[in-house]
Curated annotation (Swiss-Prot):
Biased segments, Polar residues type: 56-65
Keywords linked to the UniProt accession: Acetylation, Chaperone, Nucleus, Phosphoprotein
Ranges for region Important for H2A.Z-H2B binding: 87-108
Subunit structure: Forms a heterotrimer with H2A.Z-H2B, stabilizing the association of the histone dimer. Also, with a lower affinity, forms a heterotrimer with H2A-H2B.
Record's function text: Forms a chaperone-bound H2A.Z-H2B complex that acts as a source for SWR1 complex-dependent H2A to H2A.Z histone replacement in chromatin.
GO cellular component term of the entry, any: nucleus
Chain spans, region Disordered: 1-160
Acidic residues: bias regions: 84-94, 139-160
Name this protein carries in UniProt: Histone H2A.Z-specific chaperone CHZ1
Main location: nucleus
Matches recorded under InterPro entries: Histone_chaperone_domain_CHZ
Residues recorded with modification Phosphoserine: S68, S70
Length: 160
């Protein structure tokens, strides 16, 4: 046991000495920061600017040639724009009107025959109404059936 304790103490002293060494090594070596030298870059930019200015004066002299080219480009662009308008009209002509749902209910793309679904619901849940309440309860049942159908549609949509 005493040997183990001595080894532990030796390790602790080594850790402390290494810790002190690392602190000492950091302090005497300050990091030197270098500044970037942009003088060369500034000279290049100045040269490019002078070339650009010289190019502008030359282009002013040759402006008539560039104007005719730009007119040709404008004519081409106008022709292209005219073609795009025709393409949009063609897209509208390609729409199949048989797929458009004209009913007022949103069905998320499903075509629902409400009469058939009402019959199916009646088969699943036979009505327990008495003959006395037939006239009074029909409207409420229709509303409930519609809500049930919508809930089932929502459930089907969530499952997909």
């Amino acid at each position: 046991m005493s040997d183990e304790a001595k080894e532990k103490r030796e390790l602790e002293s080594q850790k402390e000495s290494s810790h002190n060494k690392s602190e000492k090594s950091v302090e005497p070596k300050p990091k030197r920061r270098r500044r970037r030298n942009y003088d060369d870059y500034d000279a290049e930019v100045a040269k490019e600017e002078t070339k650009a200015k010289n190019g502008l004066t030359k282009s002013e002299n040759n402006g008539t040639v560039e104007d005719s080219e730009s007119d040709m480009d404008d004519a081409k662009l106008d022709a292209l724009m005219g073609n795009e308008g025709e393409e949009e009209e063609d897209d509208l002509a390609e729409i199949d009107t048989s797929n458009i749902i004209t009913s007022g209910r949103r069905t998320r793309g499903k075509v629902i025959d409400y009469k058939k679904t009402a019959e199916e619901l009646d088969k699943k849940e036979p009505s327990t109404d008495s003959k006395d309440d037939v006239g009074y309860g029909e409207k409420e049942e229709d509303e409930e059936d519609e809500e049930d159908e919508e809930d089932e549609e929502d459930d089907d949509f969530k499952e997909q």
